[in-house]
Amino acid sequence: MATKIRLKRMGKKFYAVYRVVVMDSRTKRDGRAIEEIGLYNPNTQPSTIEIKSDRAQYWLGVGAQPTDQVLNLLKITGDWQKFKGLKGAEGTLKTAAAKPEAAVLVEEAENKAQKLKAAKAEAAAKAAEAETPAEVQHDDEKVELADVEESAPESV
């Protein structure tokens, strides 16, 4: 039986997700698979490629032929180089940066909020400090005006 390692289309319209499967070469594209050995999602950044290396090595070893698209995926993951005994068996797969945990994000947001509150309080304190001498000067002027009015003779 001639077997192929190829892609089986899954997902919605305009959002294709593929499974890397081993099938008889005469079956339909989305027909029954002998074994599913991986997943390929080209919609994420970077594309998600998950292939079970040991199963891919087994099927390549027993003569399964990869399609061109699957061959490119196997080269990216390094499975093809490992099978052929070539250099670069680690592949060129780039992993996405790890996302920080939710607790770390919450803690950073709280620290940022506390810094903002402290800055606002400090600005308010400086503004209050700047206003206080000005008010005192105005009060002195009012007191002086009141003294002048009291000492002035009453006009009839």
Swiss-Prot record:
Residues 136-145 have a biased composition (Basic and acidic residues). Keywords: Ribonucleoprotein, Ribosomal protein. It comes from the Bacteria. Residues 146-156 have a biased composition (Acidic residues). One of its GO terms (molecular function) is structural constituent of ribosome. Residues 124-156 are annotated as: Disordered. Residues 124-135 have a biased composition (Low complexity). GO terms for biological process: translation. Pfam families: Ribosomal_S16. GO terms for cellular component: cytoplasm; small ribosomal subunit. The keyword Nucleotide-binding does not apply. Belongs to the bacterial ribosomal protein bS16 family. This is Small ribosomal subunit protein bS16. It comes from Bifidobacterium animalis subsp. lactis (strain AD011). The gene is rpsP.
